[in-house]
Curated annotation (Swiss-Prot):
Keyword Nucleotide-binding: no
Gene Ontology MF, one: mRNA binding
Name the UniProt record assigns to this protein: Pentatricopeptide repeat-containing protein At1g79540
Family listed: Belongs to the PPR family. P subfamily.
Claim: Repeat is one of the keywords in the record: yes
Keywords associated with the record: Repeat
PPR repeat start-end pairs: 91-125, 126-160, 161-196, 197-231, 232-266, 267-301, 302-336, 337-371, 372-406, 407-441, 442-476, 481-515, 516-550, 551-585, 653-687, 688-722, 723-758
InterPro entries to which the protein is assigned, alphabetical: Pentatricopeptide_rpt (IPR002885), PPR_P_subfamily (IPR050872), TPR-like_helical_dom_sf (IPR011990)
Pfam families referenced in this protein's UniProt entry, alphabetically: PPR, PPR_1, PPR_2, PPR_3
Amino acid sequence: MKPQMFFRSVIQFYSKPSWMQRSYSSGNAEFNISGEVISILAKKKPIEPALEPLVPFLSKNIITSVIKDEVNRQLGFRFFIWASRRERLRSRESFGLVIDMLSEDNGCDLYWQTLEELKSGGVSVDSYCFCVLISAYAKMGMAEKAVESFGRMKEFDCRPDVFTYNVILRVMMREEVFFMLAFAVYNEMLKCNCSPNLYTFGILMDGLYKKGRTSDAQKMFDDMTGRGISPNRVTYTILISGLCQRGSADDARKLFYEMQTSGNYPDSVAHNALLDGFCKLGRMVEAFELLRLFEKDGFVLGLRGYSSLIDGLFRARRYTQAFELYANMLKKNIKPDIILYTILIQGLSKAGKIEDALKLLSSMPSKGISPDTYCYNAVIKALCGRGLLEEGRSLQLEMSETESFPDACTHTILICSMCRNGLVREAEEIFTEIEKSGCSPSVATFNALIDGLCKSGELKEARLLLHKMEVGRPASLFLRLSHSGNRSFDTMVESGSILKAYRDLAHFADTGSSPDIVSYNVLINGFCRAGDIDGALKLLNVLQLKGLSPDSVTYNTLINGLHRVGREEEAFKLFYAKDDFRHSPAVYRSLMTWSCRKRKVLVAFNLWMKYLKKISCLDDETANEIEQCFKEGETERALRRLIELDTRKDELTLGPYTIWLIGLCQSGRFHEALMVFSVLREKKILVTPPSCVKLIHGLCKREQLDAAIEVFLYTLDNNFKLMPRVCNYLLSSLLESTEKMEIVSQLTNRMERAGYNVDSMLRFEILKYHRHRKQVLIDL
């Protein structure tokens, strides 16, 4: 319809505006229409009917222009709400502009007043107008207000659309404690027949990956593809980044190539994410190979990429290359940011160049970058690691005078170091300082001090500190949250009580540092070390009443504690009573080790067979065949069969083999132990230094010196440095044998090249040998 024809049809209802009397030209049309809209806003009440005839002539630019020029913010909000009902008039510019207006003084209050006026006047509102309000609250860090706005949509007879759900989900996924609530909202979205889109799944998967919940993220991806939604470039990048975060760089690389073949060409974010994944694992050869391939495709290495590579080189202890790469980066006029400075300071600290790290830290302000808490913490940790506790403490005090105020991590580093050096009282003083400064101690801070108190034998004080953590959080709320699961939040969201659910979670998050399973494990370990196994078992019951679940460390600690006090039967009862933890290899290894110490090698062997069957690595027939071989004394055949299965499944674990080897030594079955050693060496499976020590000592005692020398040479070939005691025993045994005197000379040359202090060892053994010979002659 031509403009002139349209206005003839509506002219009877409205007086002719001045701009319509002029000729219609594209050059000044938008300006004229904007002026007419502002005139209507100033003169007409209500504005909505007067604006309707202008709809065909309005554009996104005009909407933004009017909102920007309107002096009365409330009228600007009302105009935005009216215009946003039409999707073609929505734009990022107007959306962002209104967010800025809401962020100003009383902006949100004026917006709510506008919404209330519209409701009173019977004017309907669209969910889009709530999206902008929720986004504004989120931008200002007022998440509770954002949730409240979402919850109040029903008051305005306004149903959220997928865009609104995406906005509120993004707010909730930022905090781990609100995960349950986010998924309750997602479930409500599905119940309301509001179909999630690609961005919904992207928000949920990104949040899940960032919190380490990779299996849930994978389920979400499967749900997305099951709905016929294909991933786009952003989704692929989220998946690649998530896989890299959990250490699955190879899977991420496959997905990267799949992304390329699907037509979603990776951008710099995806390239950097994959590069960072390999760097985090220290696989620098592959990282640089990837970089070469990327550069062939036109990728240009920037600050993010350089930071990942430098960090990876530091992790791989390739310090020289890391600094060379940093120098190359500077030559390309790429300036480091706070993240790279932190990486460099950490790298220098790990390389033992603490003075250089301090210089870099002090030079940052002159480069226009203020050191943050992470930078200071890296240096403080390095100083404390070298035992320079006073210097670390001084830097913490210096830090207090800057904008980078010490955080819970700073105090935890100092407390750990103090406790490690036996300075528990000083650690307690630092802990007191935290509370006085208004900085809340984290769970890790509490755990560090509890551990220090336990190791110094102050179990009563450690228990009181745990109680102090518990007092900070209402148990009833904790139990309600830990036992109810998502169901209670689903109900609250469905009934419109989303704000109450949010406040419950926020209260839970803000009421102090609740003891976690690590807190209890530290204390249980303290009681076990002190021989108070009954006190440790009571703590097991307490933590379960608090809604916590014991983990493999809990059971491993208790099983070890029970064995130490000779309560073997109870240890096995505890083991068999908890099916969940029969899957943990650590618990199995612990029981196997204790069984071997009591010379029950067959029991240890059968335990591992049960573990393999439990995790479906072994079928019953094969397991029975291997067990029968071991029972009948065919140890080598059983061992080779197991190694063959482990290698085939790519699940080779060193633990059971070394436990059996040491167990055979402890049982005096050195012939079989030597056979295990030979098979492991043949299969290129590393035999641990403790296993070698047991073998050498036992073989020397049985005068099997050739075999003992063979094992010792193996340790030299693998750069193991054994303690002087076993080396002295070997040399002493060789010197007592007249046939082995020549070998002593050859062996000491090898030892000297390996860094052993041969002179002192040899002098000691030769002196001992001569004294022995002298005594023999006297006796004769």
